[in-house]
UniProtKB/Swiss-Prot annotation:
Protein name: Succinate--CoA ligase [ADP-forming] subunit beta
Similarity comment text for this entry: Belongs to the succinate/malate CoA ligase beta subunit family.
Name of the gene this protein is made from: sucC
Description of how the protein assembles with itself and partners: Heterotetramer of two alpha and two beta subunits.
Source organism of the structure: Agrobacterium fabrum (strain C58 / ATCC 33970) (Agrobacterium tumefaciens (strain C58))
This protein's GO CC annotations: cytosol; succinate-CoA ligase complex
Listed EC numbers: 6.2.1.5
Binding site for ATP: K46, G53, R54, G55, E109, A112, E117
Biological role: Succinyl-CoA synthetase functions in the citric acid cycle (TCA), coupling the hydrolysis of succinyl-CoA to the synthesis of either ATP or GTP and thus represents the only step of substrate-level phosphorylation in the TCA. The beta subunit provides nucleotide specificity of the enzyme and binds the substrate succinate, while the binding sites for coenzyme A and phosphate are found in the alpha subunit.
A GO term, aspect molecular function: succinate-CoA ligase (ADP-forming) activity
HAMAP family, alphabetized: Succ_CoA_beta
Amino acid sequence: MNIHEYQAKALLKGYGAPVAEGVAILKVEEAEAAAKQLPGPLYVVKSQIHAGGRGKGKFKELGPDAKGGVRLAKSIEEVVSHSRDMLGNTLVTAQTGDAGKQVNRLYIEDGADIARELYCSLLVDRSVGQVAFVVSTEGGMDIEAVAHDTPEKIHTIAINPEKGVSDADVAAISKALELDGVAAEDAKALFPILYKAFNEKDMALLEVNPLIVMENGHLRVLDAKMSFDGNALFRHEDVKALRDETEEDAKEIEASKWDLAYVALDGNIGCMVNGAGLAMATMDIIKLYGKEPANFCDVGGGAGKEKVAAAFKIITADPKVEGILVNIFGGIMKCDVIAEGVIAAVKEVGLQVPLVVRLEGTNVELGKKLLNESGLAITAADDLDDAAKKIVAAING
């Protein structure tokens, strides 16, 4: 689960991290009052969407020459003007895709005198089984581009979970970021704070980009991104309360209600599979034959008829879907249950696109019999390769 920048900063502020004063608004009419609560005279008006690259993004409604989703303002009047431009309009960034995201919230923040921009994130480094700091002196920009073009500028410092962030760890991180003086002193408090927040809130990612050194030498969290482990949210009602469903795909929200592992993608072949590994293999073979998957959908090992039907309806609700491939290897999952769910869903919502079903495993013959006798336009496949060829051929006509 992701949250907005202003929410992430409020959380970090609660742990004692240095963040600027700011006020979130939902309406243009709130902009003036929000700005008056801040010291000024420099303000920053920030679009709040669950995507990066906001500063370089463009608003669909404002034309190619308009400013992006993060704007400086040197007066309260400018704050109001920027707010009027941004709220309610669609921001397109490198991470949103061409559709963009509607800006429903802004964060009005006090400006800062920036001397240096750095990058700092925490994540689980699975190669060593520890939480690690990933840092770079090249902050405020696309860290993926830095990693690709100048990987030597990316430094990873893994933290021993039994010891936490030690003085040696702080020294190593500070050296990698070329911190000295006041900034190095601030680092002694900040890096343990970030680590503590990451662990206590069960985060999957904590990204500060940029972490700035101000003209006075002190550190400040200028932007913050947080992603939380959805499996741990039952422990964090305070974090769950921060969820903004308007930022999420409606199909993914519906899938979460049925405990389905569903991720919307950009292709045109809907996939329903049991098991994450089989789901990835299914998507790979679709790409091998020249098409793109429209989703990742894992119904799991113990799904019942109703859950299967729900998954099918979610897939067919995507207007991009031109064909559907159901690929089931039944172990705990029974093929007849899959067949019953698919048949029930098709009878309820109709079948407007080609449907190919490959079943193998427990009760496979019964599952195939149910499909064959359903009277529905369902194409059976003998194996995964056959299934992929048939769904691609059906779409190509």
